[in-house]
């Protein structure tokens, strides 16, 4: 066949081959689309919860019965009672005017104290008292004036609720002041009187010839004290409200003598009237 004839035969064959190639490309040729990926997209992180502020628990309102004409007494004892309920651990350091062991014992029955305080208060000669359920809570005027009244708690009807421990602690506080180491920086004679005021004749021996307390006349008789032995203190009743505390006292010269301090009960509890 001539060249034109061969070209005529070849052209259809090429066309057939090309056609077959195109047809096969859609089945088994090189893929024209990427296969689906095996990678799984991580879920979007959940939105964080908005921060919430928990409001502080409300401070319990301690109910204190009114004292006609003396609202300061109510406020002062409420400040103490609120601490007793909400922050009892802070009370001992704040109530340094009482013997520590005595305060711990008297303040143990919180419910009895709150029950008494809820009753109307009575403004007496030297103290304000609340009584209820067989318990009396009494605060001295010096405690009220401080704005934070640490009371005496005692059975209702008790007349002489001050104890020898109160007398010994009064001597401890006085000697601590004299040795320039007060039990608290606020413990001064002006704010918390420890020397008997002399409202009544000083007469521990019952002679009938009493006068002003000697310590009132000479308050510096124990000035220069450098040390004293609290663990060696002894308290001895004398007569009526009078009580004598013996205590070894060391002066600036280093000499130690046992001193006898006579006390009585005054407006602020046990007060010192005489030193021998």
How should each PLM-predicted stretch be described?
Residues 1-15:
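N-terminal export and membrane-targeting signals
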Residues 20-23:
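C-terminal motif of bacterial Sec signal peptides marking the signal peptidase cleavage site
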Residues 25-47:
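Short, low-complexity, disordered segments immediately C-terminal to signal peptides
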Residues 25-27, 118-166, 253-276:
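Short beta-strand edge/turn micro-motifs at domain boundaries
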Residues 54-109, 157-209:
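Core segments of small alpha/beta cavity-forming domains
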Residues 109-115:
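A cross-kingdom feature marking solvent-exposed beta-strand/loop segments within repeated
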Residues 211-276:
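Extracellularly exposed regions in secreted/surface proteins, prominently low-complexity, repeat-rich
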């Amino acid at each position: 066949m001539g060249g034109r004839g061969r070209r005529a035969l070849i052209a259809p064959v090429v066309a057939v081959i090309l056609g077959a190639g195109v047809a096969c490309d859609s089945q088994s040729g090189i893929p024209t689309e990427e296969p689906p990926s095996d990678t799984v997209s991580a879920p979007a992180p959940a939105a964080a919860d908005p921060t919430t502020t928990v409001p502080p628990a409300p401070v319990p309102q301690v109910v204190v019965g009114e004292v006609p004409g003396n609202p300061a007494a109510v406020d002062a004892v409420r400040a103490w009672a609120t601490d007793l309920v909400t922050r009892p651990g802070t009370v001992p350091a704040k109530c340094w005017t009482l013997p520590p062991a005595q305060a711990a014992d008297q303040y143990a029955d919180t419910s009895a104290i709150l029950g008494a305080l809820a009753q109307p208060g009575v403004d007496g000669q030297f103290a304000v008292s609340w009584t209820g359920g067989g318990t009396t809570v009494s605060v001295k005027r010096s405690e009220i004036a401080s704005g934070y009244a640490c009371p005496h708690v005692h059975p209702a009807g008790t007349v002489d609720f001050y104890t020898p421990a109160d007398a010994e602690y009064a001597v401890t506080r006085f000697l601590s002041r004299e040795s320039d180491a007060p039990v608290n920086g606020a413990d001064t004679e002006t704010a918390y009187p420890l020397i008997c005021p002399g409202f009544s004749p000083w007469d521990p021996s019952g002679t009938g010839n009493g006068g002003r307390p000697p310590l009132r006349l000479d308050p510096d008789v124990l000035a220069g004290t450098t040390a004293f032995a609290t663990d060696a203190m002894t308290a001895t009743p004398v007569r009526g409200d009078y009580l004598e505390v013996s205590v070894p006292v060391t002066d600036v010269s280093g000499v130690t003598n046992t001193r006898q301090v006579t006390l009585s009960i005054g407006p602020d509890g046990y007060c010192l009237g005489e030193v021998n």
